[in-house]
Design a protein with these regions (language model features):
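Rhodanese-like catalytic fold shared by cysteine-dependent sulfurtransferases
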Residues: 1-40, 48-81, 90-127
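Conserved beta/loop motifs at nucleotide-recognition and modification sites
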Residues: 43
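Short cysteine clusters
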Residues: 86
């Protein structure tokens, strides 16, 4: 009985990690590591008004609909990690498919979007 409880607890704790990894969602802390250690490029796929209200320091704004046409100019080195961001993580998850189609291999979506970034106490800047 105790072994079953331990296995069940372990599976429940591991499930969100596996789900995040398979969906491409990236925690805010992991995003910071990629930015600092691997010079990841951060692209915010929100609309310009949302971007102006607050965005990750150093991020570039390319609305989701413009991504296929403008991503190559903003993220020239396809070998660097690319972190896509939006308010909640929904648009950035959709943007991942477009980025992969354009040849970007190290593409991530910030899990939970800017809401998760703010919850982690990480800084934002406004235009």
């Amino acid at each position: 009985m105790l072994i079953a409880l331990v296995l069940t607890s372990g599976a429940l704790l591991l499930a969100p990690v596996l789900q995040n990894a398979s969906s491409g969602g990236l925690s805010a802390n992991d995003a910071v590591s990629l930015i600092n250690r691997e010079k990841a490029v951060v692209v915010d796929v929100c609309e310009p008004s949302e971007f102006a209200a607050g965005h990750i320091v150093g991020s570039k704004n390319i609305p989701l609909d413009d991504l296929p046409a403008k991503l190559a100019a903003a993220a020239k080195n396809k070998g660097l990690p690319l972190i896509l961001v939006c308010q909640s993580g929904a648009r950035s998850a959709r943007a991942m498919a477009a980025a992969k189609t354009l040849g970007y291999e190290k593409v991530h979506s910030l899990g939970g979007g800017l809401a998760a970034w703010k919850s982690a106490g990480l800084p934002l800047e406004k235009v």
